[in-house]
Amino acid sequence: MTDCIFDKIINKEIPAHIVYEDDVVLAFLDISQVTPGHTLVVPKKHVANIFEYDADLASAVFARIPKIARAVQASNPDIKGLNILSNNGELAYQSVFHSHIHLIP
């Protein structure tokens, strides 16, 4: 059993407000909500950070970002812009060591 909170969310061991899911990623609302709609996009394959991605995983994960961003925007007509952010490594302030991309309206 893993102690990774994102693995537990992916495996439906703990609840989350899911925005999007397919065979490659799970996107869900960040529990801290920097702004309304703050969403995390998490690869289902456990990789600690961007340095562990291979080309196929990177292509598959990042190809889904626009679709998920449009869904976040469609959920709230007040959203006029969106930041895409990923902290990679402890020195970059990564706090959960399962790669994830923040979509912050």
Task: Show where each model-derived region lies.
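HIT superfamily nucleotide-processing domains
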Residues: 1-105
